[in-house]
Amino acid sequence: MLLLATLARAQQAPQKKDEQAPPEEDEALVPKEYSFNPLQASKELKVGNYYFKQGKYRAASLRFLEATRWDGTLVEAFLRLGEAREKQHDRKGAAEAYAKYLELAPDAKDAADVKKRLAKIKK
């Protein structure tokens, strides 16, 4: 009898649920927004250099790409991105990275060497 009374009361009382509105879109699918952050770019560059030295060129190129997104003027990241993509036999990607490097630093010490690499890739 006591059990029936408890069940009846439970049915009568409205239950409050933790109602959360579902997200309007999957946050994993939302593109990441980048703002100028030279510290994060420097970190990504360091990690990319580590991966490059380990021979993990795909991981390195992803880190160098992240560095260029955080700081679009970080010329070393574009150079290293070109080198990593070249190691992966991604000629188009390497050419794009080298071209951007030369656009940002046309008077760099190694600009002539990068121009030679770029010409070799485009052949």
Set out the residue ranges of the language-model regions.
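Long, contiguous interaction/recruitment modules in multidomain scaffold/adaptor proteins
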Residues: M1-N37
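Alpha-helical segment of the N-proximal tetratricopeptide repeat
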Residues: N37-W70
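Helix-start (N-cap) detector for alpha-helical repeat units in TPR-like alpha-solenoids
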Residues: A41, V75-E76, K109
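Canonical tetratricopeptide repeat
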Residues: R80, D113-R117
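TPR/TPR-like (Sel1-like) alpha-helical repeat modules
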Residues: H89-K109, K116
